[in-house]
Amino acid sequence: MLLVKTYLDKSPIHGVGVFASERIPKGTKMWRFVEGYDRCYSLKQFRKLPKPAREFMKNYAYRVDGEVLFTVDNDRHMNHSDKPNTVLKSGYVIARRAIRKGEEITVDYREFDPALCAAFLKQK
C-alpha cells in the first residue's frame, strides 16, 4: 500500500507512471505490504485463478519468495529504472533521495523479481 500521495500520468519511461503529488523527503517510507489490502497468492492459488485474472496479474503483480504479490493502488504502475529514486529495504519502498512534486516514482524491478527486469529489457 502506498503511504504517500501519488497520481497516475503519462510516463516518458513506459505508458503510465506513478508521480509524486507532493515533495517526498529522502528516507520516507513510501510503500509497505498491508495484509487484507495487498494480497499474496501461492503459486498453486495463482494457477487456480481464472485465465483473465492471471493474464491481468502478470502485468501488475510481483513474484516474491515463491509467491505472487498483487497490489491494488497506484504502485502497480511504478516503472523500472536502473537509477531509481526508491530502494526496497526491510519490506518497505523508501525514498532513496528527495523526490520532487510531479516527479515520476521509479523502482528497480530486480529488487522485487529478477524475471521482471529481464522481461522489461527484452521489450526495449
Which residue stretches match the model-derived regions?
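Conserved catalytic SET/PR domain of SAM-dependent protein methyltransferases, capturing the structural core
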Residues: 1-124
